[in-house]
Amino acid sequence: MSEVITVKQTNMENIYECEFNDGSFRLCTRNLVPNFNVYGERLIKYEGVEYREWNAFRSKLAGAILKGLKTNPIRKGTKVLYLGAASGTTISHVSDIIELNGKAYGVEFSPRVVRELLLVAQRRPNIFPLLADARFPQSYKSVVENVDVLYVDIAQPDQTDIAIYNAKFFLKVNGDMLLVIKARSIDVTKDPKEIYKTEVEKLENSNFETIQIINLDPYDKDHAIVLSKYKG
């Protein structure tokens, strides 16, 4: 296996780039829980610090960063509501980034999958798993505070509407949303670019200002991620 030569801070807080002796580069985050990985990712020791390799083929946020995300609203101390947290791959890296003074509320609908998320959260006190349906934010309103960032990665035809509805409950004015648009979950017959355009129009008609749209290919085919700011 290739060995790490250097680890450098990127222009995004708490996100690093690891360079290996085979000439390759990988994103990584500083491991909040040393000696433990989450999804089989490589642990990298460099100058007394342990980092976790962040696989862009397993995490759409990592893919977005490698595809040119201009700014990452998730930083040290950020409060995040994550819809579609699944078994914890991406939210574990969010946990590394926000550190212990941040909070990541992870909503997941599948009882089987949320059990895996609970195992991740047992070692990471800044992750708060919630077994809930994102279509009904009223059901977790009593436990989720207002957040700085809403991250949405759910495979539903009305995924954008669900995101907007949750923003009305939880996202601070001038907060940021990262919405993963899964074109094939919305309409398998349409050109993904047309779907992205339609979904962005929905956001803009609901007081969101579009900052950036990123096509996630080759990391995730027929997916885009939209960064927008909520105007309330």
Swiss-Prot record:
Tell me what this protein is called: Fibrillarin-like rRNA/tRNA 2'-O-methyltransferase
- Organism expressing this protein natively: Saccharolobus solfataricus (strain ATCC 35092 / DSM 1617 / JCM 11322 / P2)
> Keyword set for this entry?
Methyltransferase, RNA-binding, rRNA processing, Transferase, tRNA processing
What does this protein do, in the record's words? Answer: Involved in pre-rRNA and tRNA processing. Utilizes the methyl donor S-adenosyl-L-methionine to catalyze the site-specific 2'-hydroxyl methylation of ribose moieties in rRNA and tRNA. Site specificity is provided by a guide RNA that base pairs with the substrate. Methylation occurs at a characteristic distance from the sequence involved in base pairing with the guide RNA.
Output one GO BP term: box C/D sno(s)RNA 3'-end processing
Q: Name one GO molecular function term.
A: histone H2AQ104 methyltransferase activity
HAMAP family the UniProt entry points to: RNA_methyltransf_FlpA
Question: Its quaternary structure?
Answer: Interacts with nop5. Component of box C/D small ribonucleoprotein (sRNP) particles that contain rpl7ae, FlpA and nop5, plus a guide RNA. These sRNP particles form homodimers, giving rise to an asymmetric holoenzyme.
The UniProt record lists the EC number as: 2.1.1.-
Organism classification? Archaea, Thermoproteota, Thermoprotei, Sulfolobales, Sulfolobaceae
Which family is this protein grouped under? Answer: Belongs to the methyltransferase superfamily. Fibrillarin family.
Pfam families in the record, alphabetically? Answer: Fibrillarin (PF01269)
